Design a protein with these regions (language model features):
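N-proximal helix/coil linker or "cap" segments that precede and/or mark the start of modular domains
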Residues: 245-290, 295-306, 332, 349-359, ...
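A non-transmembrane, solvent-exposed segment enriched in polar/low-complexity residues
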Residues: 21-201
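Conserved redox-active cysteine motifs that mediate thiol-disulfide chemistry
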Residues: 307-308, 312-329
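Thiol/disulfide oxidoreductase modules built on the thioredoxin-like
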Residues: 363, 370-418
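Structural microenvironment flanking redox-active thiols in thiol-disulfide oxidoreductases
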Residues: 322-361, 370-379
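Amphipathic alpha-helical repeat scaffolds of TPR domains
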Residues: 221-237
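Bacterial Sec-dependent N-terminal signal peptides
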Residues: 1-32, 419-421
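Helix-turn-helix repeat elements of alpha-solenoid scaffolds
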Residues: 203-210, 242-248
Length: 421
């Protein structure tokens, strides 16, 4: 949680990409040395990917590494120290994958890192220098205050500290899942923090708003892939970025027209489509996915004019599984009255854990597979940065509720279906 404020800089100092796209692959070679830390593995990923997906492991030998990737167009990538990712708190090394060689000097203090390459990484360095010169003097005092709260064990609220203690002593997975769900409830209401931590969070929000205004001035004055990446990053982290969705929407056609073949164009199209459609009163977005046997199903065919719950989940997401489990009695109660559930699991590399979880939980409805986020379903449904979500629809495909609990689903179905059956 120390990154709660420190992530301020990580989010504000986004990656910079500046070049035209190419339709053929070119080589990008990464060469680097690591100083003042014992690390044996780096994780390479696109900056737009979840670190749990599409990882490439780069071995570190004698404090040095070298790796070559093939790219179709300049794009922001990240290097993450494996041990940091495993701890659950990491600061990625952001760079621009471009044709040629990129050199890295990586230190235990990330602020000392040096990245040199061709034009794009020079632009990145200049942008970050200007940005940090403006905002670091304002951000550092917030970081120091947060550190002081942690040292005095005064960052979290009493309720949150109690749950953390119980989680540390929980003996089984089911208990841990229940405790994590309670902790998430506290976070959603802001009651996970002490009063002083809440005040510092408000100051951080104000600073981020100022940084966002500065960044959008840069975007407007520099309509390049630099700005395109900023738009995408803000859309992915819309709640925390404090970006204006209408401003993003108005700028997107400019960039999509200029870079129609860039990967960012399709990602943003899917996310903006979901933002417009996926809301109470909006309509579901149709898709086709395979089940565990490989048979492809279209969502609209599964729903077939019924009231339906779309359940996006993952075998590694405890709160998602708890939500899915809670819906089983509701499904059994209303399945013969015009209600169905369609599960979609976001899985990594393979479906082994999904298959095992379904067998354990005995989910009685169909479950489809979104493997490695290939179809952008989470983007389309506005849950890019979470394990999943649920969406209740009526028999015409209109969304009635987003992330309702089981009792809310039962309440809505009881009202809507009482005169039908």
């Amino acid at each position: 949680m120390k990154k709660h404020i420190r992530v301020l800089l990580a989010l504000m100092v986004s990656g910079v990409v500046l070049a035209s796209c190419t339709t053929r692959e070119v080589s990008c070679t990464l060469k680097g040395r690591i100083h003042d830390r014992n690390s044996d593995t780096l994780i390479l990923k696109r900056a737009t990917d979840d670190p749990r997906f599409n990882q490439v492991l780069i071995p570190v030998r004698d404090s040095a590494f070298e790796f070559t990737i093939q790219i179709y167009h300049p794009e922001a990538y990240e290097l993450i120290f494996k041990e940091e990712l495993e701890r659950g708190s990491w600061r990625p090394v952001l760079f621009i994958a471009e044709k040629g060689e990129i050199s890295f000097e990586l230190y235990s203090n990330p602020d000392e890192n040096k990245i040199t390459g061709r034009n794009l990484n020079s632009v990145l360095a200049e942008y970050n220098k200007e940005f940090l010169g403006m905002f670091r003097p304002k951000a550092d005092p917030l970081n120091d205050s947060i550190d002081a709260l942690f040292q005095k064990n005064e960052y979290f609220s009493a309720e949150m500290k109690l749950l953390q203690s119980e989680l540390a002593n929980a003996g089984d997975n089911e208990s841990r899942m229940a405790l994590r769900e309670k902790m998430e409830d506290l976070r959603s209401t802001g009651n996970d923090l002490s009063p002083r931590a809440k005040d510092l969070t408000r100051q951080g929000d104000s600073l981020r708003a100022e940084a966002t205004r500065w960044r959008y001035k840069y975007i407007e004055e520099n309509p390049s892939i630099v700005s395109y990446y900023f738009l995408l990053n803000d859309l992915r982290y819309l709640e925390s970025s404090q970006a204006n969705i209408e401003e993003i929407k108005s700028l997107y056609p400019v960039f999509a027209g200029k870079y129609p073949e860039h990967a960012y164009t399709e990602i943003m199209r899917s996310m903006l489509e979901g933002h417009d459609a996926i809301k109470v009163g909006g309509s579901f977005i149709d898709f086709s996915l395979p089940d565990l046997d490989g048979t492809v199903h279209r969502l609209s065919d599964i729903i077939g004019g019924k009231y339906a719950l779309i359940d996006l989940w993952a075998s590694w997401c405890g709160p998602c599984i708890a939500t899915s489990r809670s819906m089983i009695p509701v499904y059994e109660e209303f399945r013969d009255r015009g209600f169905t559930v369609c599960g979609v699991a976001a899985e990594i590399d393979n479906t082994d854990q999904m298959r095992a979880r379904i067998e354990k939980e005995k989910f009685p409805w169909i479950n489809l597979v979104e493997l490695d986020h290939k179809n952008h379903i989470w983007d389309k449904y506005g849950v890019s940065n979470s394990g999943g979500g649920t969406f209740l629809m009526d028999n015409e495909g209109t969304i009635l509720a987003i992330n309702p609990d089981a009792e809310k689903v039962r309440e809505i179905l009881s009202e809507k279906l009482k005169q039908t059956f």
